[in-house]
């Protein structure tokens, strides 16, 4: 049975049992800061298990893309060295949200394995939580499973939790016994770590929600969460002891082997082949879901995965850029299941290729230094300072150092490395200051939002929060948070800032500075009481600041037009990565891997302004997610949407169609004017555009016009002539700079000739160690080069002081480089003047910050000869 058939059979079976099929969510968890990646099938349902979110069904089944390469669940280090570990895998799962529980879950699992897949019953083994008598009773008395093939295990093995907090509960695991010819014992036994008994399905009976203090809070309704790794199941059904030998991996495995030089005689089961095969899967899908290689968070995990794969390719002798070539084979493998990979293939290949090209130099440098260390190394553990230097100076990842050391039967001194990292963090921390916000008071009541159609309303006060506590009242001057039953104030969400305004009645006035929304849907009106005493259950009139709301609406509608214009000019692959819609300006972050040229920015701006001049009506439609997709609405991949969604349509021929809960203009002409004020890079592969609208855009243009008038006045030209005049001045300046450079070069050449006579002979070697004046650092290097040509058997150390900083250059003629290293001589001098440097054996360059120590330091060179 092929992988595709097994995947579909699982979905079909549970659909026949009343489960709704859910598509795989993005690898990036939605609205969950506790996880780097979706690492289990239940993650997209986390809020459902916790009772925060409700779905229109109580049974679900899915095949979820998962990644375990960072955070608590991290299999990265094991990939390649075992037959079963992966950084990317698919998890089959069936879920019950307060519907069925242990009995049905166990019966379904047993029926699917033994009847649908025809697995031999004699090859199955089961484990249960040692305190879960109910589960064991179902297995023994209802299923008829032999008690002597049931292991009772502790919380470490059979009490599952996704993170430090959140849904959790006892579990029952099903194992497959590969037979006596393979080493290893059953779960719970001393030799359980062998490959004979392989876990294939984990049934989690979610009864609790673990709190931050460790308390196991019972869930309102018990749930079921099961997970079965597709790759492991396929290996069992295809009678393979190695996941990489199954049909789902073989095309990639063969492609990797074919990339290696024939004389290397690489086998299919080579550890490096497994690493590359696995890592291209996780890297490609991470990029599809919007992750870009960087030095932090998810981007750093992706970078580690890509670079680890590349390193193993180099180890096998693949000398060319190769990793990105595998993406097309992967896309073909998954085209029927995950067509989004094929659609984004060009982007995936581009990101992978660029990262490999960037890493090649780092890999060569780091490997050279590490090989030198290992060759001369006599112990069993590489010093942490060396590991840190490779990481900090050359950008060589610690996990690669560890990987290479492991291959040579060495370990790395991680504690020593962490000491060096701590020192670095302490240095960095001195330049930063950050605070951790305290957890606020949770309000269960949901606020009804009225602000789409009105800017004021009357409502009762549901709650008042002061100093992080619920209070009955606040008085004049008190800062507080007011929660209303109904509100016209928009609460910050979807990138749009919250409204400001006034809550008042005859006796009180509360100034609202901003409005937030709790997870429950309660609106928090933050501000200060200007008049009277405000009490819970008081009736107040909520008045939104009309001017601020109009500015925000202009900017939000302009953001939608900008998004659509980006798709036209830069292509459909552009994905929204974040936005901030305020009253003064808008900011839009999006995926794009190069600087946007000026002509494209002008075209984007022009498209938006033409739509504004068209002054078409903005249409709002309430529908379900499927209806929205039929309209062509842009959705954020991986984001969860409710039963009903709000669709905003702008411009002729549905120019922009997006799902949005924000506030907008009624006519596009209300935006007035759109002006891009900046375009920049936020991180690798993510660009940012900032723009102004309306009167703010007009004022921006006015300031530019005033500046142009001043420049015209200073250059004694008209506004239409000013560009030509400034161009002429710049040309003149460059000519003058060339003349200055020519004069400086002549001075430097003359200094070189003058310096020859200062060379002194020490033990048959000419030594020149002195300070020169009136030259640049670049000139200094040229002077040393010429002196090396004119002086035979010479050691030269020259320094220049510019703005209280010392520049140093050392040179050694080639006949002396075996006796004297320019790099070592430079560091000898640099240390004495508070600096450092680097270079080759015949030429090195550096500097320092203590010019007062320079003369003494230069004199000390003589002692080295």
UniProtKB/Swiss-Prot annotation:
One of its GO terms (molecular function) is tRNA binding. InterPro entries: aa-tRNA-synth_II/BPL/LPL (IPR045864), Ala-tRNA-lgiase_IIc (IPR002318), Ala-tRNA-ligase_IIc_anticod-bd (IPR018162), Ala-tRNA-synth_IIc_core (IPR018165), Ala-tRNA-synth_IIc_N (IPR018164), Ala-tRNA_ligase (IPR050058), Ala_tRNA_ligase_euk/bac (IPR023033), DHHA1_dom (IPR003156). Its EC number is 6.1.1.7. GO terms for biological process: alanyl-tRNA aminoacylation; negative regulation of DNA-templated transcription. The keyword Nucleus does not apply. Its cofactor is Zn(2+). The keyword Transport does not apply. It comes from the Bacteria. Consists of three domains; the N-terminal catalytic domain, the editing domain and the C-terminal C-Ala domain. The editing domain removes incorrectly charged amino acids, while the C-Ala domain, along with tRNA(Ala), serves as a bridge to cooperatively bring together the editing and aminoacylation centers thus stimulating deacylation of misacylated tRNAs. Belongs to the class-II aminoacyl-tRNA synthetase family. Catalyzes the attachment of alanine to tRNA(Ala) in a two-step reaction: alanine is first activated by ATP to form Ala-AMP and then transferred to the acceptor end of tRNA(Ala). Also edits incorrectly charged Ser-tRNA(Ala) and Gly-tRNA(Ala) via its editing domain. This is Alanine--tRNA ligase. It comes from Vesicomyosocius okutanii subsp. Calyptogena okutanii (strain HA). The lineage of its organism: Bacteria, Pseudomonadati, Pseudomonadota, Gammaproteobacteria, Candidatus Pseudothioglobaceae.
């Amino acid at each position: 049975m092929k992988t595709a058939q097994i995947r579909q059979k699982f979905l079909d079976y549970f659909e026949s049992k009343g489960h709704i099929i859910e598509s795989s969510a993005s690898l990036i968890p939605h609205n969950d800061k506790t996880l780097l990646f979706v690492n289990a099938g239940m993650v997209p349902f986390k809020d459902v298990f916790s009772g925060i979110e409700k779905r229109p069904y109580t049974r679900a089944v899915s095949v979820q893309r998962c990644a375990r390469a960072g955070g608590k669940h991290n299999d990265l280090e094991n990939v390649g060295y075992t037959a079963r570990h992966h950084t990317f895998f698919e998890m089959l799962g069936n879920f019950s949200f307060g519907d069925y529980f242990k009995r049905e879950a166990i019966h379904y699992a047993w029926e699917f394995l033994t009847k649908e897949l025809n697995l031999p019953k004699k090859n199955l083994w089961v484990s249960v939580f040692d305190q879960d008598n109910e589960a064991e009773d179902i297995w023994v008395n209802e299923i008829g499973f032999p008690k002597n093939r049931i292991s009772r295990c502790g919380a470490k093995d059979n009490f599952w939790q996704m993170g430090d907090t959140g849904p959790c509960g006892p579990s029952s695991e099903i194992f497959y016994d590969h037979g006596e010819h393979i080493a290893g014992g059953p779960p719970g036994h001393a030799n359980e770590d062998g490959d004979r008994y392989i876990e294939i399905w984990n049934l989690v009976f979610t009864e609790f929600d673990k709190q931050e203090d460790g308390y196991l809070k019972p869930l309102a309704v018990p749930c079921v969460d099961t997970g079965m790794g597709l790759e492991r199941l396929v290996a069992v059904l295809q009678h393979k002891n190695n996941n990489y030998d199954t049909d789902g991996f073989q095309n990639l495995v063969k492609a990797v082997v074919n990339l290696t030089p024939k004389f290397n005689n690489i086998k299919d089961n080579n550890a490096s082949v497994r690493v590359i095969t696995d890592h291209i899967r996780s890297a490609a899908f991470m990029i599809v879901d919007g992750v870009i290689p960087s030095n932090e968070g998810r981007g750093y995990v992706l970078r580690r995965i890509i670079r680890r794969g590349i390193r193993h390719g180099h180890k096998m002798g693949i000398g060319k850029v190769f990793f990105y070539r595998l993406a097309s084979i992967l896309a073909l493998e998954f085209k029927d299941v995950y067509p989004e990979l094929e659609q984004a293939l060009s982007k995936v290949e581009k990101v992978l290729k660029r990262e490999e090209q960037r890493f090649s130099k780092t890999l060569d440098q780091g490997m050279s230094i590490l090989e030198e260390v290992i060759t001369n190394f006599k112990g069993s553990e590489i010093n942490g300072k060396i590991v840190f230097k490779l990481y900090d100076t050359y950008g060589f990842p610690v996990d690669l150092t560890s990987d290479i050391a492991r291959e040579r039967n060495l370990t790395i001194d991680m504690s020593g490395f962490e000491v060096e990292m701590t020192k670095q963090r302490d240095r960095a921390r001195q330049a930063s200051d950050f605070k951790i916000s305290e957890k606020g008071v949770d309000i269960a009541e949901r606020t009804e939002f009225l602000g789409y159609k009105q800017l004021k309303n009357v409502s009762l006060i549901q709650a008042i929060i002061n100093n992080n506590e619920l209070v009955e009242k606040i008085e004049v001057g008190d800062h507080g948070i007011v929660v209303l039953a109904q509100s016209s104030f928009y609460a910050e969400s979807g990138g749009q800032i919250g409204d400001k305004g006034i809550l008042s009645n005859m006796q009180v006035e509360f100034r609202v500075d901003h409005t937030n929304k709790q997870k429950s849907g309660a609106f928090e009106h933050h501000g200060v009481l200007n008049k009277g005493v405000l009490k819970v259950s008081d009736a107040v009139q909520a008045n939104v600041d009309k001017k601020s709301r109009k500015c925000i609406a202009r900017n939000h509608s302009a953001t939608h037009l900008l998004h659509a214009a980006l798709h036209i000019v830069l292509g459909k692959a552009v994905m929204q990565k974040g936005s901030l819609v305020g009253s003064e300006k808008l900011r839009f972050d999006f995926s794009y891997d190069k600087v946007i040229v000026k002509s494209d920015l002008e075209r984007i701006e022009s498209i938006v302004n033409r739509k504004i001049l068209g002054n078409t009506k903005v249409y709002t439609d309430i529908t379900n997610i499927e209806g929205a997709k039929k309209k062509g609405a842009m959705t954020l991949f991986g984001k969860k949407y409710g039963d009903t969604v709000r669709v905003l349509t702008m411009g002729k021929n549905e120019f922009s169609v997006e799902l949005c809960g924000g506030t907008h203009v009624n006519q596009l002409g209300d935006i007035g004017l759109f002006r891009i004020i900046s375009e920049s890079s936020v991180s690798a592969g993510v660009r940012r555009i900032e723009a102004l609208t309306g009167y703010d855009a007009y004022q921006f243009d006015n300031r530019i016009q005033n500046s142009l008038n001043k420049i015209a006045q200073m250059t004694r030209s008209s506004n239409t002539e000013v560009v030509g005049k400034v161009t002429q001045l710049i040309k003149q300046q460059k000519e003058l700079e060339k003349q200055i450079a020519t004069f400086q070069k002549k001075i430097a050449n003359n200094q070189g000739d003058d310096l020859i006579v200062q060379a002194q002979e020490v033990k048959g070697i000419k030594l020149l160690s002195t300070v020169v004046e009136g030259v640049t650092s670049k000139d200094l290097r040229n002077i040393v080069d010429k002196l090396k040509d004119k002086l035979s058997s010479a050691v030269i150390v020259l320094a220049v002081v510019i703005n209280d900083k010392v520049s140093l250059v050392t040179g050694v003629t080639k006949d002396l480089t075996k006796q004297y290293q320019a790099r070592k001589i430079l560091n000898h001098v640099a240390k004495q003047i508070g600096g450092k440097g680097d270079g080759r054996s015949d030429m090195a360059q550096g500097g320092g910050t203590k010019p007062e120590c320079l003369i003494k330091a230069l004199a000390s060179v003589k002692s080295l000869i």
